[in-house]
Amino acid sequence: SLQSGTYVDDNYANEKMKNLNEAYVGLFLDQQKKHSVEVGILPSYIGFETAVSHTNLTLTRSLLAENSPYFMTGIKYNYKPSDKWSFSGFVTNGWQRIQKPEKDIPPAFGTQISYKSSSNSVVNWSTFIGKEFNGMDYTMRYFSNLYWDKTWSNKWRTISGLDYGIQTLSNDDTAPWFSPVIITQYTINSKWQSAFRAEYYQDTKNT
């Protein structure tokens, strides 16, 4: 799919193919469709919000979402042993990046575990590890995103999440950051919905 606008200018500033939103292919590796592989510019496996506002509970995106990837470029392997469990592994070009920044930068790695106890409840845990630019040099970044998406009734839905990351610095110091958030949405009728978001973001070293 293609894209343009201020979102593209902000999030794809250093990319030559910035007008590509998603471009990937996938295939199942077995007849039972438990194993699959996808390759290309993929939707981000981190977080519960997308760049398309109407798919989120609130029209404005959370600080947590704005400071984590909206897309990833690389390879995804998924194993889905049942309707409840899903396990994925990723090899990517890095944190929200289509092109690799430098030839000597190794690929980044990630994982995703999803547990869907019912059609109304999903718990998801995603991780990322890779070298990212800290303002001076490329150093290691470790990141974890955990959230619970629960639909309580045909009117109430909540999402609670927690991000925690660590960026190593060139002077052997570390720069941690974290962000808890809770979002609730109430459906008034078929035409109207209301939502409330409470969040906290701490990044004392401006990672």
Summary of predicted features, one role per range:
Residues Q3-E22, D30-S114, N124-K131:
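Surface-exposed coil loops of outer-membrane beta-barrel proteins
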Residues K84-S86, D104-I105, T111-T207:
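Detector for outer-membrane/organellar transmembrane beta-barrel domains
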